[in-house]
């Protein structure tokens, strides 16, 4: 029995147990009508299942369950329909930004779902039990009804804007346009907060499944939402409390004037030019509001303590990294050492250190010391003997494991990930 990319958790499938295929198809049709994303794909999927439901309604399903040759295929068909319902329902309940970012993956799941349901339908010996031309014609029509699932052009443009942002594109405008359609009854800041909560849930699910690709996408989306959040609180507060606007403004104005008067070295405004100090303060505030990529994963590092998430012998899961480390170990080692020592280390410096320790036959001692510092930084259990044996038996595997662990935990140094500042504009 196939599973569709982490869809269909056992707890959710158990809630649908007891429903026959016809009732499950009805649930899918209702869920498709309320989908927030992939609406066209949900409608096509539901329309295809309507054809199957119309056929099953004419059969005595209770009678078919009495025979083992038809009972098992029916149960497999119902399991596939349950996962199909969870797929359609996820387009309503899961994070809108996550579904948008994983657009083509969801499209692939729709294609796989329809193919699996059709395959199980062919296993049911309907033609031998209900032998008439009308049923055969409808079966042939179902087989010919091969829907084409695709990603909507508008959603694709939004996905490109969020995942591959143009430095001159304001993410606030993009998010306001998309979230206003997804949350029509919520103000923008509430919708953004709700999306952040859902993204945190998606992040935990991806981390538990060790899905590095999804973790990076979700971390990027969280960085975008936090960057946008930092630009709207003052405006949203003024909209929600207009009666306090005058008093707050006068108080802030008085405090600002007082601080300007108390500073003897602060230059006065002359000839319509604002003082340089005020510009520096504004630029400092703008820079401090930016959220570095991967910040959330680093802040939640405590949840990963006391164990390695990357297997020592699992280096082949990243062939490119494995080959790069095999032929150029200094490059991977320098990145690991930069994080373990909290200071940047170039590949040349790492190569010099390794060659120097190799002259006294203690290269493994040096690299295992860096591994120990990395364990202490990431709060991973272990001992010096384990570190030494890991680098002695297979130094390449140990380096790949350490860098994969850094990627899983998002424990990049601040200089490893750089996010360009958002475009700024003046309000008149």
From Swiss-Prot:
Disulfide bonds: none annotated. One of its GO terms (biological process) is cell surface receptor signaling pathway. It is a single-pass membrane protein. One of its GO terms (cellular component) is membrane. Its main location: membrane. InterPro entries: Adaptor_Cbl_N_dom_sf, MCAfunc, PLAC_motif_containing. Residues 233-280 have a biased composition (Basic and acidic residues). Expressed in roots, coleoptiles, leaves, stalks, apical meristems, immature ears, embryos, endosperm, pericarp, silks and tassel spikelets. Not detected in pollen. Residues 281-290 have a biased composition (Polar residues). The chain crosses the membrane at residues 354-370. PANTHER family: PROTEIN MID1-COMPLEMENTING ACTIVITY 1. NCBIfam families: A_thal_Cys_rich. This is Cell number regulator 13. It comes from Zea mays. The gene is CNR13.
